[in-house]
């Protein structure tokens, strides 16, 4: 392409397959990443060659609206951020499986704790994995507030069950998997914080002054949006890109749809969590 004096290259954003091509070409050409939704052809016989010809024609006529592709350092942050989201989902699945094993053993502690990720629940699980099954020993691991609220007899009864060697092994394995997932999550967050403190210290500090946003949310927002707001014309454009703005789909004075777009799923989750946290804060929001 350099031999033929090509200066601009456009490509479809197909899953992750565009990323290695983008990395190879970015030092040499002006690149455009096109959303396939906006460059669809009229239905006809389809092939890769015809698609390439169509994208080239759209590029020459300046019809390609390039997608937002963040700088390399932000892309690295995104990998850590999205890994944390994946690990959180994995932890939830493992906790559900762990509780299912305990329910199978007639251990009903989850009926009395706030959630299966609480310290008391984890302490009991660790004891089971070590072969400790006596209710009078397990009840000592329960937080006093839980015992005072429900009564020691009810808590002790919830810890009486029939636990086989196989189930102890399953509990031990699931606990090890949970510990590994938690350790990986901490490593990812530590790396994100290290990069943000080195590359974007001022932005990281300012974000945490907003009610509802702490360290984890601040690093996630930087990873998903970046720090160059010139990429978005207005705040409405950013809201739309995040998938938080209703679509404008109206024809002949009839509203067809007002549902939000898919947007950036990870960013939307973070912003919604921050909004819920801010709604519960005592700080005044201006």
Where are these regions (language model features)?
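A detector of single, family-specific signature residues
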Residues: 1-286
């Amino acid at each position: 392409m350099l031999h033929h004096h090509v200066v601009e290259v456009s490509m479809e954003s197909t899953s992750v397959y565009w990323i290695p091509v983008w990395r190879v070409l970015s030092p040499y050409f002006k690149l455009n990443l096109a959303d396939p939704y906006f460059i669809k052809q009229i239905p006809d016989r389809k092939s890769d060659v015809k698609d390439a010809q169509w994208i080239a024609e759209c590029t020459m006529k300046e019809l390609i609206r390039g997608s937002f592709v963040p700088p390399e350092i932000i892309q690295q942050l995104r990998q850590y951020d999205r890994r944390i989201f994946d690990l959180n989902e994995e932890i939830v699945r493992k906790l559900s499986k762990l509780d299912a094993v305990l329910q199978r053993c007639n251990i009903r502690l989850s009926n009395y704790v706030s959630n299966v990720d609480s310290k008391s629940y984890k302490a009991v699980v660790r004891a089971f994995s070590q072969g400790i099954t006596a209710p009078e020993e397990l009840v000592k691991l329960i937080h006093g507030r839980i015992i005072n609220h429900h009564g020691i007899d009810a808590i002790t009864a919830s810890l009486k069950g029939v636990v086989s060697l196989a189930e102890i092994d399953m509990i031990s394995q699931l606990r090890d998997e949970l510990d590994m997932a938690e350790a990986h999550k901490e490593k990812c967050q530590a790396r994100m914080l290290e990069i943000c403190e080195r590359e974007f210290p001022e932005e990281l500090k300012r974000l945490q002054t907003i009610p509802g946003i702490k360290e984890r949310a601040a690093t996630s927002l930087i990873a998903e949006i970046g720090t160059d707001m010139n990429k978005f014309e207005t705040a409405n454009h950013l809201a739309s890109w995040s998938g938080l703005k209703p679509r404008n789909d109206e024809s002949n004075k009839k509203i067809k749809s007002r549902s939000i777009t898919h947007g950036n799923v990870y960013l939307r989750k973070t912003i919604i969590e921050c909004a819920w946290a801010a709604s519960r804060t005592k700080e005044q929001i201006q």
